[in-house]
Amino acid sequence: MNAKRPLDHFRAFARRPVGLTAIVSRGDGSWKRPARLLDLGLGGACMEMLEAVPNGTAISLAVEAPHLWDPLFLEGEVVWLHSLEGAARLGVRFYHRSGRTLRTLTELLEAEAYH
């Protein structure tokens, strides 16, 4: 049987398409850059930036969402990179340091306001 597999077949957590903005900063705080999240899940995200960030780079994201009072702060690591003309698309694996962050991310994924 040759059924087409869904895109999330290799992920532990499904992703949802989003159109959210974020500020990405390097883990050591040496720079901050704007980004646009393309998809988001409990385990990570795909985003576009104007410049490439190497695989293995520790980053922090401050995600803006219409229904949140404050940005959602997430920590992670760049796990893949595709260079585009004038931009870069990258994948991030999240490291949830607290249940509060995970709970807020779950609420964000359940909300309809950001679609």
Stretches found by the model and what they are:
Residues 72-74, 90:
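PAS and PAS-like sensory/regulatory domains
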Residues 33-35, 74-81:
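Short beta-strand-centered aromatic/proline hotspots
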Residues 16, 29, 55-57, 70, ...:
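Residue-level preference for beta-strand/loop junctions
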Residues 1-40, 106-115:
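N-terminal helix initiation/capping motif
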Residues 20-60, 91-93:
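Short strand-loop-strand
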Residues 65-69:
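Short, charged beta-turn/beta-strand-edge "cap" motif at the junction between a beta-strand
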Residues 81-108:
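C-terminal structural segments of small proteins and small subunits
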